[in-house]
Regions:
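N-terminal helix-turn-helix
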Residues: 1-81, 245-249
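Amphipathic alpha-helical effector-binding/dimerization core
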Residues: 63-157
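Short, basic/aromatic recognition patches
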Residues: 83-91, 155-200, 241, 246
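Juxtadomain coupling helices with adjacent low-complexity linkers
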Residues: 170, 176, 194-195, 212-250
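Sensor-regulatory modules in signal-transduction proteins
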Residues: 203-206
């Protein structure tokens, strides 16, 4: 037996549908788009209009700013650090490796949080530290989702080859960034430092914009890079999705 409330479920479907519409829309279109019969759509819209949630103009409906005001209140009380902390700890417990939260600061990735792995082996990284974008997994995530003009300017400058695996040639780096966007994550196999392996994923806000990155770092030896990444990448992706959902991402 289902514990769901059909009227509430229908209401949330209508609100979600209206939020995705770029213009005012009529009852017939809402009914087709949501799969809810017209009579139910009309009654729900009438209730939402009375409560100030939707606006009706010539029998076409749109959401009012009331909903956005309600949503912004809890978000304004939550900082990215507050939201991410328990998720990072969970990621640390599941992988045993160092975890971090980073944002773009000018042409670097800035670590807002960094927790050492349970093995007590300190991987490069500290809260407040700033690191290159092109040769680190979190950096590549942020660079890949930056403005096109910024990417062009950044990839056109001379980049230091920190290790033999660092990608410094423009065309190769642009292809790497394309792969990051396509795959939904970035990896770093000893590109930042010898023996250091990383995987990172983007964090999205309610508008679909990448605002941060979360990931894991570990020490690897004897060519274990990809094996290590395969081990903790699913947890990294799950952590990024969890934070994004709290921020209102779809």
């Amino acid at each position: 037996m289902s514990n769901s409330a059909p009227a509430v479920e229908a209401c949330t479907k209508i609100i979600t549908f209206l939020a995705e519409c770029e213009q005012e829309i009529g009852i017939s279109e809402i009914s087709r788009g949501t799969g809810i019969n017209k009579n139910m759509v009309f009654r729900i819209l009438n209730t939402l209009e009375n409560e100030g949630w939707v606006y009706c103009n010539a029998q076409k409906y749109s959401l009012t700013l009331l909903l956005f005001g309600l949503v912004s209140k809890p978000l304004s009380r939550l900082s990215l650090n507050t939201i991410a902390s328990p998720v990072l700890y969970d990621l640390l417990n599941k992988t045993g490796e160092s975890t971090y939260l980073g944002i773009l600061k000018e042409d670097k990735v800035l670590y807002l949080q960094h927790f050492d792995g349970v093995k007590n082996v300190r991987v490069a990284g500290r809260v407040g530290g700033e690191y290159d974008l092109y040769c680190s997994a979190p950096g590549k995530v942020l660079l890949a989702h930056a403005e096109k003009s910024f990417i062009e300017e950044y990839t056109s400058k001379a980049l230091e080859k920190r290790t033999k695996n660092s990608i410094t040639e423009k065309s190769a780096l642009l292809q790497e960034l394309e792969n990051v966007r396509k795959n939904g994550y970035a990896t770093d196999c000893e590109e930042f430092g010898n023996g250091i392996t990383c995987a990172a994923a983007p964090i999205y806000d309610y508008s679909g914009k990448v605002i941060a990155t979360v990931g894991c770092s570990a020490f690897t030896t004897n060519g274990e890079c990809m094996e290590m990444i395969e081990k903790f990448l699913p947890y990294v992706l799950s952590a990024a999705k969890k934070i994004s959902l709290i921020l209102g991402a779809k």
